[in-house]
Amino acid sequence: GGHSLLLDGGDVNTGVPESDLQDAVPDFKGMNLLGYQAMAVGNHEFDKPLAVLKMQRDLAQFPMLSANIYEHGKRMFDPYKVFTVGGLRIGVMGFTTEDTYKLVLPENVKNIEFRSVTAEAAKVVPELRAKVDVVIAATHMGHYENGNHGTQSPGDVELARAVKGIDLVVGGHTQNPACMKAENVLDRAYVPGTECKPDRQNGTWIVQAHEWGKYVGRADFEYRNGEFKLVKYALIPVNLKKPVKGADGKTTLVPYTEEIAEDPDMLALLTPYQAFGQQKLGIEIGASDGRLEGDRAVVRAKPASLAVLIGLAAMDKTRADFAIVNAGGVRDSLAAGKITYKDVLKVQPFGNTLSTVDLSGSEVMDYLNAAAKMSVGSGAFAQFAGVSLEISSGKVTNVRINKAPLDPGKTYRMVINNFQATGGDGYPKVSDHKSHVNTGFVDADVLRAFIIKHSPLKAADYQPGDAVVRR
């Protein structure tokens, strides 16, 4: 027996080229078929123009929820939805990271406010409590260990600590399993298929099913005599596989747990969309003799070869002296072997354009110092190409461009993407600088052309080496 609610923590948009090409229509239709009942609005929902988001909201046969997004002073989405499940009244409210405004293009969020989550929750929770037995928050704010959110906006832990009366948070955004090793200590070595202990803060359970559909999170609760009790929780791997070496020395991929069979109705729904995407994106454009590193955990923490490639491609196209690449703009690695246009779009899915700005040497130093302060682990983390430097305590020294020491009186051309140029990720806004030019060159197209021109790529040519030293 029992009853269920199927919820999502947001970010349906961006990252899968076949989906991006089709404005996530196949994703929303698939979610409709699965019977989703509500989702939080994620920051990536604003990667495309508002007309696309509003089309998606109409397409979804379930509410997209966010209590803290306001358009022209009014809530853009429903703040919550009340469900009656087995005679129990359950209120599901939605919240979106306050960082959204700096994670997307400014023109996509014009006249939109991302208000304080805790302030909005302090209003919504009492309102819901008067109507329901159980309060759940579907959020896209992130799970930060012990509430240590650094330069990011507050996440689920901080929400639970600040606002009493939330029974469960179903979260997203930080892309981790949110399994705990001890109180306020994340299990950073979680193995798929093993026990996952959810976080608990101020009487609120907090769960997050990692990323990209790798898991379905299942939380079983009982409600008796006014008490909402967690009976068990599991992260169920969705056909995740691990490499296993056989007696013959060959490595094969084996499921962590029992394989889940394809659903014929879902397959029939999605196959035409997949075929259309493959037709458009499966063209081989080049090859690389080695892996070019762009994985999230690497590119947001230290210099990475794929970011160097992206920066050099942008420099080549715009005749710039150096490039700064925000780590959040690098979404995947390029494996050794053939490279398709789809691979490029997985790396750079946002359709950003390249911006150039001609700066004096002293202006360059100011900008580099600002970039150097971008925190490790965030999408703002700065990657560099064409420049060598040392960073110590957030200060930049020993800057060399074109292998020569930085000259305060000389003019240098910097290339970044238009998102950074307009102040995205907290970068200094340079779009109003007298020399700023939005070239209109789309980043993925520039990378594609560079790969075609220089293929086969020699991975060794793009290794960051010791060009950027952090002390």
Question: How should these model regions be labeled?
Answer:
Residues 1-241, 268, 301-313, 354, ...:
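Acidic, metal/ion-coordinating pockets
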Residues 1-4, 130, 230-231, 238-471:
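Non-catalytic terminal accessory segments
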